[in-house]
Amino acid sequence: MAYQHCPFDTLLILDFETTSDAANQDYPCEVIQFAIVAYDVPNDKIREDISFNKYVKPVLNRTLTKNCVDFTGIPQRSIDTADTFDVVYEQFQQWLITLGLEEGKFAFVCDSRQDLWRIAQYQMKLSNIQMPAFFRQYINLYKIFTNEMDRMGPKELSATTNIGKMNEYYDLPTIGRAHDAMDDCLNIATILQRMINMGAKVTVNELLTCCASWRRQPLVYNKEWRSSFMDAGKIFERVLPLVVTTIRAGDFRLEMYGVCRYCRKGMDVCGTSHQQTPHDLYKNEEDPIHFAKIAGYY
C-alpha cells in the first residue's frame, strides 16, 4: 500500500531547533539540535534504529535565551558540550554514507518549508558550507496535509502548530515533547505513515531555486517586522538567496534532481551568490538588518 503512494524507497524526516529571541525576529538563529529518523516506504516501517540526533553548539550567541530554553527544553549544558555545526554536519554526511543511500533516490520530509528553506540555508551561510542538492528539493508534509483535508473533509482543529493540527486531524497521540527535534521527527513520521496508508500521494512538492519573478516587484512590508514572525518571513524571502518554488504532485522527476528549475544550472553553481539582491530593502531600512549583516549578505 505505502509503496504505491510514494516514489522513494526511503524518506528522511528532518527537524531543526534553533537559538531564538521571541521578541526579536531580526535574530541570527543558529541550529542547536539536528535530528532525523528514517521511514522505510516499501515495508511501511518507521525506523527508529536509523536515526541521527545531535545537539549543536552555536557560535554567535553561545548562551541560550530563556525563551529558547523554555521553548525547546534544551538545557545550556547540552549545548556547551556539543560540537559546532560544521562538525555535526560532517558527522551527518558520514551517517548518510553509512546508510548507502543514493542521491536522488531518497527525500527529506519536514512539517513546513522553514527547516530547509530558512534554517538550513541561513546556517549553511553562517558556517560557509554550500547548500547541498539533497536539501534543495523536499516534501513539505503540511502542504500535502492541507490537500488531504480538501480530499477527505475538513475538521475543526484547536491545535496551533502544524504537527499538532495533523496529529489532531488523524487522532494520533503526541509523542514526547513538542520542539524536541527527535520527538518532532517521530511525530511527523507517524503522521506521514498514516497519511500514506490513507491514500495520500507523498512526493517532493517544493524546490529551492535562485530566482522568482515576484521578487522583481517592490516589497511592501510592515516596518515593525522585527516583532512579527509572519512579517519577518517577507524579509527572509528577499534576503535569502534561494526561494521556495512549489511543484504539483507528480511533477517531480528524478532527472530534475541537482538542477535549478529556474536557471537550469547545477546546484554546485546555482545559489552560490544572490541573483536578486534586495538593494532597495537594505537602502530603505533605517536600522541595519542584523541577521543579514552578520551573515554577510550585505
Swiss-Prot record:
Protein name, please?
3'-5' exonuclease crn-4
UniProt note: pH dependence:
Optimum pH is 7.5 for DNase activity. Most efficient at pH 6.5 to 9.0. Reduced DNase activity in acidic conditions at pH 5.5 to 6.5 or in basic conditions at pH 9.5 to 10.0.
Species assigned in the record: Caenorhabditis elegans
Q: Where is coiled-coil annotated?
A: none
Q: Which gene encodes it?
A: crn-4
At the top of the EC hierarchy, this enzyme's class is hydrolase
Tell me where on the tree of life, at the top rank, the source sits: Eukaryota
Q: Does the keyword Transmembrane helix apply?
A: no
Domain Exonuclease: start-end pairs: 12-192
The task this protein performs is described as: Possesses 3'->5' exoribonuclease activity in digestion of DNA and RNA. Cleaves nucleic acid substrates with efficiencies in the following order: single-stranded RNA (ssRNA) > double-stranded DNA (dsDNA) > single-stranded DNA (ssDNA). Involved in apoptotic DNA degradation.
Q: How is the cofactor bound?
A: Probably binds Mg(2+) in vivo, Mn(2+) ions are found in the crystal structure.
Kindly give the Pfam families that the UniProt entry links to this protein.
RNase_T (PF00929)
InterPro entries given for it? 3-5_Exoribonuclease, ERI-1_3'hExo-like, Exonuclease_RNaseT/DNA_pol3, RNaseH-like_sf, RNaseH_sf
Q: Which residues bind Mg(2+)?
A: D15, E17, D184
Q: What did gene disruption experiments reveal?
A: RNAi-mediated knockdown results in accumulation of apoptotic DNA in 1.5-fold stage embryos and delayed appearance of embryonic cell corpses during development.
GO terms for cellular component:
cytoplasm
